[in-house]
Regions:
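Structural recognition of alpha-helix starts/caps
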Residues: 1-147
């Protein structure tokens, strides 16, 4: 079995620079020296859960100059937490959510500008977003509709 990976992505600050990565791995049938590595990598793949299971809620906030999204989610005590967001298609380039305030009482709050949408998309229209929550060695993926 030959595994091939090609990934197109962008590194963004003020300007997005496209990049590409490729990797290939050939696996022989049966046990392999790579089994442990593959199992470890598979364990790190985000597991899909519901918004309720992740304790995640997302809502629009329109008090500032730009529309923002505020995200509340369950946060295990004593563990760092990261949040990433994707739009419904690869044409979306949403910013990385930033912590709105330090996690406390089992809750974390993040926010991000509703920016990086494809041309012609209304920032006020409903949209399906995918959130990836990373805490320690665990990652989950949550699909949520922003009305």
């Amino acid at each position: 079995v030959r595994l091939r990976l090609k990934i197109d992505y962008a590194v963004c600050e003020k300007l997005c620079v496209p990049a590409e990565g490729r990797a290939e791995l050939t696996l022989a049938p049966g046990n392999s020296v790579h089994n442990a590595d593959l199992s470890a990598a598979e364990a790190r793949v985000p597991k899909q859960v519901t918004a309720a299971q992740a304790g995640l809620t997302a809502r629009r906030v329109t008090t500032g100059a730009k529309p923002q999204v505020a995200v509340d989610l369950a946060a295990p005590p004593g563990q760092p937490i990261e949040l990433f967001v994707e739009g419904p298609t690869p044409k979306w380039a949403l910013p990385i959510p930033k912590p709105a305030k330090p996690a406390s009482n089992g809750q974390a709050q993040f926010s991000f500008d509703l920016d990086g949408m494809p041309p012609g998309v209304d920032a006020k229209s409903p949209v399906d977003l995918t959130f990836t929550v990373v805490t320690g060695d665990r990652a989950v993926e949550v699909k949520s509709r922003l009305d």
